[in-house]
Structure formats: structure tokens, C-alpha cells
Swiss-Prot record:
Database matches in CDD domains: RHOD_YceA (cd01518)
Gene3D superfamilies: 3.30.70.100, Rhodanese-like domain (3.40.250.10)
EC number assigned by the record: 1.14.-.-
Family designation: Belongs to the TrhO family.
Cross-referenced PANTHER family: RHODANESE-LIKE DOMAIN-CONTAINING PROTEIN 7-RELATED, THIOSULFATE SULFURTRANSFERASE/RHODANESE-LIKE DOMAIN-CONTAINING PROTEIN 2
Protein name (Swiss-Prot/TrEMBL): tRNA uridine(34) hydroxylase
Enzyme class: oxidoreductase
Keywords on record: Oxidoreductase, tRNA processing
GO BP annotations, alphabetical order: tRNA modification
Length: 309
């Protein structure tokens, strides 16, 4: 299934994941890497026993070639993906990695291929999260929720997805309402989170199909309950309604998204510090970052891209 393009740009970006048993996943690494490189495709794909996850970008024909290869594999015949556009290549290289999990929760025996929550289409999401009997949970990390979230959602303020299970177990009040609705960027974390919640005894568990990205694509801004921008894991940094590129930039010292206002802060120095990390880094750290930033600037003058940029 291919979702429609919303924003124009020379590079096609495809976000995908699929939970499915793939005992032979390691055998797909080399052909995927070679095919991607041959077609000018960059990004990251994770392969594991439980499926595939990743985001890739490149020319239209290249992306279509990689997706066609994947769907030619019996396990991925029903693979869905979401498309958007980027004004410049958002990745530096292509990486196909073998993993224990395609999204790391760190809890044994959680299998979304066997037990999972109920999908909710973007057009039905507003009604669900507006229901007073529903607890809404953002399953993303704190640096993501800082720039955008659904109105009224609980923010676990996790640093990594591995912290989510402990947060759930500590917050016994989550059982006080009959319905739990969860969401994430593209759908993979909240899907795995629903499998965990079911295992923890929650009965009515729902998750946003296609994640925030699909919601921002399909739901008109005037009807939207989304507030802010959606963090994405590439050089676009964020996207907004209609999946157009957002205005956030990334602090390359701490990897936090920063606004245009934060760039004017006296604590901001490109590639070296921002208001999020200035007080948690040492002068030695900043000296090292300045040296890296100098190498990036020199690479730009040569018309190249530094690997650390």
C-alpha cells in the first residue's frame, strides 16, 4: 500500500515497518544493501526475527525498486509504507542492520505478531481521544514530545523506549479508565506498546494507524487536535500538517530539536551547544565539538558532506 505524496521535493522519503516472523532475515541484508546503493537510496533499515523497520530516501525509481524487492519476499507482501518529500537528501549513507528487535523495548515474550491492540484510523482518532473514558499516551521520547503532541495526552518523559514498560508499571492509575489510546511517529512503537499493555492486563487498547505522520497527512489542519510539529529521525528534523518540512533544526551537540527562537539564545553555538545542553556539557566537550564543526565547515567549502554533520 502506498500513501499519497503531500509535499513536493526532489527526494522521495519512505517510512515503513512490518511486524512479521522472518526466520531468514539475515539473508536479506546483503541484497538490500547492494540494491539500495545501486539505486542511490540512503537511510536505515532494521531487520530482525520480528520484522522490518526503517526510513529510506532517494530518487523515485530507486525507492520503488527497494520497495518492490521487499514486497517480492513472501513475508513482506503486505508491507505498507508512508511517503513524503524532502528538499535535500536527509541521510548520509545507507545502512541495513541486523537486530534482536526492530524497535527496542527490552521486554521478553512481547510479540505484536500474536497479540496487539486495535487500530484506529486517523479520521476516527479525534473521537477516541476526546472520549472522557480514554487515557491518551504518547509513547515517544521527551525530545520528541517537546516540540509537538496531541492535546491532553500523557507524556511519560522517557529518554528511550526501553523506559516505557517501567513507566506503565509505576503508574497504576492508568487502570482507572477503561480505554487506552496510544500513538507514536509512524506506528511501530505504539503497536509494540499495545502488545505490552495487553500483556499487563489492559483490555481496551487502541493505537493510531500510521502514527502521527498519517494523521498529519489525512486530517485537515482546521480539524486537527495535534499541537506543534512532529519530530522525524532525519535531517528534516520535523514535519507539520500536510507533511511539509518543519522549521526546527537539530543541535548536533545533544541531538535535540531547536526552534528559531532558541537559535537566537546566547547559549547557542552551531554544532557546539544550545539551551538544552549548554549546562550539561564541559568546556572540553565544547572544544571537541568546535573542532568537529570546523571540519564540517571545511567539507562544505569543498562541496562535500562531513560524516558528522
Amino acid at each position: 500500500m502506498t500513501d499519497s505524496l503531500i509535499h513536493t521535493g526532489p527526494f522521495l522519503v519512505a517510512a515503513l515497518y512490518h511486524f512479521v516472523s522472518v526466520p531468514r532475515f539475515a539473508s536479506l541484508q546483503a541484497p538490500l544493501q547492494a540494491l539500495s546503493e545501486e539505486n542511490g537510496v540512503k537511510g536505515t533499515l532494521l531487520l530482525a526475527h520480528e520484522g522490518i523497520n526503517g526510513t529510506i530516501a532517494g530518487p523515485d525509481a530507486g525507492i520503488h525498486a527497494v520497495l518492490a524487492f521487499l514486497r517480492a519476499q513472501p513475508e513482506f507482501a503486505r508491507l505498507e509504507h508512508k511517503e513524503s518529500r524532502a528538499s535535500k537528501m536527509p541521510f548520509l549513507r545507507m545502512k541495513v542492520k541486523l537486530k534482536k528487535e526492530i524497535v527496542t523495548m527490552g521486554v521478553e515474550d512481547i510479540d505484536p505478531n500474536k497479540v496487539v491492540g486495535t487500530y484506529v484510523a486517523p479520521r476516527d482518532w479525534n473521537a477516541l481521544i476526546s472520549d472522557p473514558d480514554t487515557i491518551v499516551i504518547d509513547t515517544r521520547n521527551d525530545y520528541e514530545t517537546a516540540i509537538g503532541t496531541f492535546r491532553g495526552a500523557l507524556d511519560p518523559k522517557t529518554k528511550t523506549f526501553r523506559e516505557f514498560p517501567d513507566w506503565v508499571r509505576r503508574n497504576t492509575g492508568l487502570h482507572n479508565k477503561p480505554k487506552v489510546a496510544m500513538y507514536c511517529t509512524g506506528g511501530i512503537r505504539c503497536e509494540k506498546a499495545t502488545a505490552f499493555m495487553k500483556a499487563e492486563g489492559f483490555d481496551e487498547v487502541y493505537h493510531l494507524k500510521g502514527g502521527i505522520l498519517k494523521y498529519l497527512e489525512e486530517v485537515p489542519q482546521e480539524e486537527s487536535l495535534w499541537e506543534g510539529a512532529c519530530f522525524v529521525f532525519d535531517e528534516r528534523v520535523s514535519v507539520e500538517h500536510g507533511l511539509k518540512e518543519g522549521e526546527h533544526r537539530l543541535c548536533h551537540a545533544c541531538r535535540n530539536p531547536i526552534t528559531s527562537e532558541e537559535i537566537t539564545s546566547p547559549l547557542y553555538e552551531e554544532g557546539v551547544s544550545c539551551s538544552h545542553c549548554y549546562h550539561t556539557r564541559t568546556e572540553e566537550d565544547r572544544l571537541r565539538y568546535r573542532q568537529r564543526q570546523l571540519q564540517i565547515a571545511l567539507a562544505r567549502k569543498r562541496g562535500q558532506r562531513h560524516i558528522g554533520s
